[in-house]
Amino acid sequence: LADTVPIIFSTITGNGYKLAVAAAEAVPNHVGPYNIRYITDEVIDKFDTFVISYWCNHGTADDDTIDLISRMHGKKLIVIGTLGVSVDTAHAAKVCANVIALASEHNTLLGHYLCRGSIDLKRTFARTRIPEGQKGHLSMERFEKQKQSLGHPNAEELDAARAAVAEFLSKA
C-alpha cells in the first residue's frame, strides 16, 4: 500500500467531490475518492501520501479537513480546494496561506491548488436577513457577487487541478 494514494474529499455543494474526481484521473495508483467523514486513524496509518480536497470556510479549510489534517503526522499531502470568490483576491491569498500552514505543520506539503467553487445561494441568501452589524450578515451587494460563483469549478479549473496534482505527485 506504500505507493497507493487515497483521495479524500469534503463537500457540501459537490465542489470538493468534483475536484477529487479530477485528481483521481491524475493519480495512477489511487483509491477513492472517499468522503472525509469515513476516514479513520487506521486508514491514516496505512498510507504515506494523500490527496485531500476541501472547501473554504471562514478564511481556511472546512472543519472536517482541519480535523483530518491535524490527525496526520509525517505524511505527504496534496491539498486541493474550492473558494466561493475569485482566486485572485486578498481573501484567496489568506486562505492559501492558512491552508498551507495547516498542511505543513506536521506533514510535508507536496502542493496546494485552489480554484473557484459554486456557493449554495439558498444557504447564503438566508444571511441577508441577519441585521447589518450582526455576525453572519451578508449584504445584498455581496450576495449578488456570490452569483458569479455558479458553474465553478468549470472544465478549465478541473483540467488545471489534474495538471497540478500530477505535478505535485511527481515530487513524492
Name each model feature, range by range:
Residues A2, A26-Y34, F47-I52, H58-A172:
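FMN-binding flavodoxin-like domain, especially the glycine-rich phosphate-binding loop
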Residues D3-A26:
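N-terminal beta1-alpha1 ligand-phosphate binding loop
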Residues T40-K46:
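Short amphipathic alpha-helix with an adjacent loop that forms part of the alpha/beta core around
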Residues R37:
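Catalytic-core regions of hydrolytic enzymes
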